[in-house]
Design a protein with these regions (language model features):
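Cleavable N-terminal export/targeting peptides
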Residues: 1-22
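Acidic/histidine-enriched, beta-strand-rich ligand/metal-binding domains
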Residues: 5, 46-49, 66, 72-78, ...
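Short glycine/proline- and aromatic-enriched beta-strand/turn motifs that initiate or cap beta-hairpins
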Residues: 19-60, 108, 120-122, 128-130, ...
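Residue-level detector of the transmembrane beta-barrel scaffold of outer-membrane proteins
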Residues: 20-24, 67-71, 108-112, 164-166, ...
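Outer-membrane beta-barrel channels and translocator barrels
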Residues: 21, 61-65, 102-106, 160-162
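Residues that define the transmembrane beta-barrel architecture of outer-membrane proteins
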Residues: 21, 46-52, 85-93, 145-151, ...
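Predominantly the C-terminal beta-signal and adjacent terminal strand-loop region
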Residues: 30-41, 69-81, 126, 138-197
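Detector for outer-membrane/organellar transmembrane beta-barrel domains
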Residues: 90-98, 104, 108-121
Length: 197
């Protein structure tokens, strides 16, 4: 956790010294697939959480039209199932390798792919009576890892080198559940708008 926070601080410092730093606000939808295997029989359930994300990144030129955009962000998602409210808050560090194409003098298209390192801060459930469960609690029979690694890609458009419209999809590579016989993976869809300084 400390290493990821340190990396995020370094990226923020590096971005602050750049003329291409982008601040973004967006929507995310996280789809979580949980599988449980017992006696050779596997059952599965998929749930989704929706929320907001804010981030900052810097698109650094590598060569020609090839760039890399390291960044740091945070997201907050919620869902309700009956009288139970679920919420998740986390930090993430994307490293998006991208290639740009000029569509016109004012419009440019970038396609990107890369990893995202995700660190969960809060993941809990609370009912109407105030009973609360922290899914990162190691004493739970079914508890979760705070760390996740996602791979994905997408595209963004920049207008007059100031406005950015971005869409992406990332697939979780790790089983985030620590309990025996469980496999839980997350996929994330995101749409955002950003301003380039």
């Amino acid at each position: 956790m400390k290493k990821l926070l340190f990396l995020a601080a370094v990226l923020l410092t590096a971005g602050a010294a750049s003329a291409q730093i982008t601040y973004s606000l967006g929507y995310i939808s996280t789809s979580t697939k949980a599988e449980y295997t017992l006696g050779g029989i596997t059952s599965s359930k998929t749930t989704s959480m929706n929320g907001l994300t804010i981030s900052v990144d810097d698109n650094i030129n590598l060569t020609g039209d090839l760039n890399v955009a390291p960044g740091v962000g945070m997201d907050f998602s919620m869902r309700k199932d009956g009288d139970i409210k679920y919420k998740k808050f986390g930090l993430y560090v994307p490293v998006d390798f991208n290639y740009g194409f000029a569509l016109s003098s004012n419009l440019k298209l970038f396609v990107y792919a890369g990893p995202t390192f995700d660190l969960g801060i809060i993941k809990d459930a609370k009912d109407d009576n105030g009973n609360k469960v922290n899914y990162y609690d190691k004493d739970l029979v079914v508890n979760y890892s705070r760390f996740d690694l996602l791979l994905g890609g997408g595209a963004w458009l920049t207008f007059q080198d100031q406005l950015r419209f971005k869409v992406g999809y990332k697939v979780g590579m790790l089983n985030t559940c620590k309990a025996d016989n469980y496999t839980v993976k997350n996929n994330v869809l995101s749409v955002s708008v950003g301003y380039i300084f």
